[in-house]
Curated annotation (Swiss-Prot):
Catalytic activity: 2-C-methyl-D-erythritol 4-phosphate + NADP(+) = 1-deoxy-D-xylulose 5-phosphate + NADPH + H(+)
Residues bound to 1-deoxy-D-xylulose 5-phosphate: 128, 154-155, 184, 207, 220, 225-226, 229
Natural source organism: Pseudomonas fluorescens (strain SBW25)
Residues that, per the record, bind Mn(2+): 153, 155, 229
Name of the protein in its database record: 1-deoxy-D-xylulose 5-phosphate reductoisomerase
Transmembrane segments: none
PANTHER family: 1-DEOXY-D-XYLULOSE 5-PHOSPHATE REDUCTOISOMERASE, 1-DEOXY-D-XYLULOSE 5-PHOSPHATE REDUCTOISOMERASE, CHLOROPLASTIC
Record EC number: 1.1.1.267
InterPro entries with a match to the protein in the record: DXP_reductoisomerase, DXP_reductoisomerase_C, DXP_reductoisomerase_N, DXPR_C, DXPR_C_sf, NAD(P)-bd_dom_sf
Amino acid sequence: MSRLQQVTVLGATGSVGLSSLDVIARHPDRYQVFALTGFTRMSELLALCVRHAPRFAVVPEAAAARTLQDDLRAAGLATQVLVGEEGLCQVSADAEVDTVVAAIVGAAGLRPTLAAVDAGKKILLANKEALVMSGALFMQAVRKSGAVLLPLDSEHNAIFQCMPGDYARGLSQVGVRRILLTASGGPFRKTPLAELEQVSPDQACAHPNWSMGRKISVDSASMMNKGLELIEACWLFDARPDQVEVVIHPQSVIHSLVDYVDGSVLAQLGNPDMRTPIANALAWPERIDSGVAPLDLFAVARLDFEAPDEQRFPCLRLARQAAEAGNSAPAMLNAANEVAVAAFLERRIRFPQIASIIEDVLALEPVVTVSDLGAVFEADTKARALAEQWLNRNVR
């Protein structure tokens, strides 16, 4: 009998983490959960530990760790609880771990994901901020360690599936003309512009096709999510920003396309369910059952496409500008967006002010060369401070 693949799931209580665990549980003959991590949903993390019996669990604070450890013992589990970023990095780099699902949302996921990279793991990357913030450094570390990097975003996984196996030689070398990154357009695609001032966090989080966490749902509504994915695609596939085009596709059936110089366009289709890209990346280069229902083309009936309106979605324009500027600009973009989205979810600002905060931060802070991780976090810290200053000036 072959050895079970040991899997660490960073961000286990989030939507991607839960979908990953669903796929893993379908294949007990292949995979075993090594570690689970959570941030705020401690009762959910406990339930996941009871179900999957990991070797380790990681939580952010010592008090939460003590409570969880007591609860695990009461449940008869030997799971050891670790604390903080050090614990995250430990379960990402442990010698027994084969695969790391990097699904922590935001900048907090960067260090543990890099720990997995440096340890040469197979990394299923859902944390887009890791590449957005430190793309050049991140990809350099991947090449140095020999880590296997597989995208979990449905769009990037679709691109990966449509690319030739030797795409790392360069897009022009393998005949790729451009990448077409699809977007649903979110819940406000047809909302009159004047009404965007009044939309609520709950409305922003009501995605028409996907079930996601609140932060990424707001990013989808503003199309910042697609802007971050554009930056991520540039690093994953060594593309220039002008080689990545965003296309609105409301049905979310085509997850992305690759346009070749001979006139061929390859697309990956499927029901909008994260378990498809997770299963693809988890078993690559093989295929396994994901639990996702087959796509019914007769029920889909039609596929629509339209160009994104940058007046409606200024965050997409800002992200493209950051991609073109490079260096510290994407890290600042991401940091300002995280602060702005948190303020919107707390009802401190209106929806259009998310883009206003980001644009002002990018205008105030000059782009600097990023040569190490310290410079990345310095840019992140400065941008967060400027965004908070904006809130202090403009929010009563």
